[in-house]
Amino acid sequence: MTAMEKNGAGRKICVITGGSSGIGFATAMRMGKKGDAVVLAARTPSKLEQAIAALKAEDIEAFACPCDISNWASVKALARYAQSLGEVTAVMHIAGMSPHMGDAEKIMRGNALGTVHIHDAFYPVIADGGCLIDTSSMSAYLAPSRIM
């Protein structure tokens, strides 16, 4: 490994929130096979470890960063970590909460405030020409049965 590789110079980084499973993990696999190094962010360290192992088994350069997107300090730490690894060229914000995952306040903190945190933390560090993509689920269109 050269000195440039050790400090991340020239390495393209794709950050994926919710990357330990589902759409996030599939996105990590796709971006990694394209040649980007991927940083997976999720709340559960054990799930992150499993996802990283699966990616590395496919010869994908992958890193884990436990992160609670509803917590500003946690998201800021994620942005710093990703930037320390190389040039952040893509952020795929896929993490989110479904209605069955908690009360309304918890869901709003994760989905709405979490999205604001991701934007605020990554806009200053993303490379020129980079992209930040937010993904949402169909639950945004489904009214809870108690409201109707």
Q: Residues of each region from the PLM?
A:
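A glycine-rich helix->loop->beta "capping" turn
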Residues: A9, I60-E61, Y81-H93, M101, ...
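Rossmann-fold scaffold of SDR-type NAD(P)-dependent oxidoreductases
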Residues: T17, V88-G96, D134
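Conserved glycine-rich cofactor-binding loop
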Residues: S20-S21
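N-terminal Rossmann-fold NAD(P) dinucleotide-binding loop
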Residues: G24-F25
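Conserved glycine-rich Rossmann-like NAD(P)H-binding loop of the short-chain dehydrogenase/reductase
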Residues: K34-Q50
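The beta1-alpha1 cofactor-binding region of Rossmann-like NAD(H)/NADP(H)-dependent oxidoreductases
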Residues: P66-A77, A112-T115
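Active-site Tyr-X3-Lys motif and surrounding loop/helix of classical short-chain dehydrogenase/reductase
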Residues: R80, G102-R109
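Catalytic loop of short-chain dehydrogenase/reductase
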Residues: M97-E105, D128-M148
